[in-house]
Structures are given as C-alpha cells and as structure tokens.
C-alpha cells in the first residue's frame, strides 16, 4: 500500500514548488500529546518563519540533521544530498582535509527547507561560509555550552558578558537560544578571513570572557579543566564544524526551537518559551528579530589583535583534525602530567 501523502504548495522567488509530504501525521516528539509534533506541523512551522530561517541558510552549504525514528531516535547527519533530488534543488560542493568532498544542500528559498523536512530533517546546520567562496567564512559564532553543575542562569550571564566584549569593540552581535541548553551569539564579518582567523577570534572572545568572569566562564578545551562553568566552544569555528541555524527545530521532547532574541530579552527568557507553536505566534507579531544581521559586516582586526595581545597562542583542535600549525600537544593535562615510570 502506498504511503499517505499531502502536496504542499510553496511560493518562492522563482515560482511555486509543490512538496510531496509523505506520512504527514508521523510524530517526532515523545514529550508532546499524541497527534502533536507531526511532520506536517514541522513543514507548516518552517513555512511560517520562512524569511527568518532562509536568512540563516541562504547560499550556505548545509548539513541536515535527520531523525526518521523521532527526536529521541538516532540522528543521521546528512552531508550528501540524494541523487534523486528534484532538479530545482541547489547544492554546493565542499572539500574536507581528508581529501574527500560532499555535495551538500544549499538552500536559497523555503522550498528547500520543506523538501528537507520531508526527509525527516528537524534542524539545519549551515556552514559559516557561502557557496561563492566556501573557504571564506562570513559569520563568527560563539557557542555557550553549560557544563554539568552550571545551568541556564549562568549561560545568560555569560552571554551578556560576550555582548560587553563585542560592544567594547564597536561590534553588533545577535543572540539566540540554541533550543537545547545554551546560547549562540552571531557576528557578521567582512569577506577575506580564513577559518583559522575566525577560530582565533572565537578563542580571543572565550579567553577574554573567562578573564572577566572566571567564576562563570571557561575557555579550556579539556573537560577536566572546565569545572562547573559555561564553556565557550571556540572549536565551533574550526573548519567543517557547524551549529543549528536560527529557527531550527531541535531534537528535544517538546519541539523547542533555536530562537533569535533581542539582547534585552536574554535576561528573562527560557529555552522552553520557544517551540514550533509559540515561535509561529511570535514571528507573526514581531517578524524576524535578526532581520538586520546582514546590515553590518565587521572587520575582525580588533579581535585578532586581542588574540595576539593575550599571548596564549593556539589551543587544541577536535580529535578528528590532523595536527594543526602551532597547536599544543593534544593530550589531556592529567595524562600529560603523569610521571614516567622508571
């Protein structure tokens, strides 16, 4: 028997697309009442926030985080779009240090988003660079990740300290909830910088925030050194590392989303305030509160100068990376300190 389906018309700048949504009543979220959080609900949510979600994805190679068994099932990170894709689907080819390459989805309109949701995509993980030059990122991302023993209140405080650092350099930054436990802070950058440059900028911010608030924040890569603090994950700016885009639905029990915020909202908001229904209402009232994110693109020289002044040099890369130039020994400190047996 053929799977049930509905056809959803989607308006785009190049004409109407029709997305065939199979099994529209399939549910994804165990924490919701029966019949809530269906595939069709996801499609309708993304259509309702179309301009906002596309603003974060447009022309960016994008990894799809798919959950065909539901939000609590195993995630499938899809870097290669299927050959059976419609002819209008846009793609971008990216290359990895291993020498391999992948043809990734490159959304240019909300029909691309709806097509991906049909494949059980919940959230979208775009590169911080665009198709025209994938090796030149234009988006600095600061990822705040609370360690066990720290919580949302600490994340909020650290986010506001990140804002102080950027404000002090005359830079306009944009916060959003991660939709899970943390906060992401974005900054648009001028073209011409490398992934190494942006990672150094993220590392400079992390170290500066830790210097200001050592009780709350840490830039330490090794978990054993972080304590019960909020980790500013500078390695999210390493090449081929991504985070969930603005408006992405997260694989959480209550269908929470990564919610763009105005800075004045950060002290009083909660992650649970924003799900696929409340965000639709909010978007209808306020539109995209990050609509101005592309207005100003920043020169990163002040952040790179801060990195140099700090004088701490490189920090470890994630384990899947080859040894990088200037990187310290990639060994956790407790092991490095072990005395040699005699």
Residue ranges and their predicted role:
Residues 60-92:
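Polyanion/phosphate-binding surface patch
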Residues 18, 61-63, 74, 172, ...:
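Beta-sheet entry/capping signal
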Residues 64-67, 173-179, 220-224:
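Short beta-strand
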Residues 1-44, 51-54, 58, 101, ...:
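C-terminal accessory nucleic-acid interaction domains of nucleic acid-metabolism proteins
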Residues 76, 84-115:
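Class II aminoacyl-tRNA synthetase-like tRNA-binding/catalytic domains
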Residues 105-178, 189-197, 342:
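Signature for HUH/AEP ssDNA processing cores
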Residues 184-190, 231-234:
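A short beta-strand motif that forms the metal-chelation/ATP-contact edge
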């Amino acid at each position: 028997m053929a799977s049930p389906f509905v056809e959803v018309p989607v308006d785009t700048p190049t004409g109407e697309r029709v997305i065939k949504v199979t099994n529209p009543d399939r549910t994804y979220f165990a924490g919701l009442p029966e019949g809530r959080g269906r595939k069709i609900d996801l499609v309708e949510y993304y259509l309702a926030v179309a301009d906002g979600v596309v603003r974060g994805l447009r022309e960016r190679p994008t990894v799809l985080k798919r959950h065909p068994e539901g939000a609590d099932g195993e995630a499938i990170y899809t870097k290669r779009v299927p050959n059976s894709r419609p002819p209008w689907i846009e793609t971008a080819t990216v290359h990895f240090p291993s020498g391999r390459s992948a043809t990734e989805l490159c959304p240019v309109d909300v029909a691309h988003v709806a097509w991906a949701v049909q494949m059980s995509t919940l959230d979208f993980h775009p590169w911080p660079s665009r198709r025209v030059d994938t090796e030149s990122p234009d988006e600095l991302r600061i990822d705040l990740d609370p360690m066990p023993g720290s919580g949302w209140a600490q994340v909020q405080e650290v986010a506001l300290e990140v804002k102080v650092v950027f404000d002090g350099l005359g830079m306009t930054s944009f916060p959003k909830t991660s939709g899970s436990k943390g906060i992401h802070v974005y900054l648009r950058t001028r073209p011409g910088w490398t992934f190494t440059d942006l990672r150094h900028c993220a590392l400079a911010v992390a170290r500066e925030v830790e210097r200001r608030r050592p009780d709350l924040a840490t830039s330490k890569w090794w978990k054993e050194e972080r304590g019960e603090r909020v980790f500013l994950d500078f390695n999210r700016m390493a090449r081929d590392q991504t985070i969930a885009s603005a408006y992405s639905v997260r694989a959480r029990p209550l269908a929470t989303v990564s919610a763009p915020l105005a800075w004045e909202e950060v002290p009083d908001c909660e992650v649970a305030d924003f799900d696929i229904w409340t965000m639709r209402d909010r978007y209808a009232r306020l539109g995209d509160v990050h609509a101005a994110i592309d207005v100003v693109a920043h020169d990163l020289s002040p952040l790179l100068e801060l990195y140099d002044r700090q004088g701490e040099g490189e920090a470890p890369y994630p384990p899947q990376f080859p040894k990088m130039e200037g990187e310290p020994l990639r060994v956790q400190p407790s092991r490095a300190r072990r005395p040699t047996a005699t």
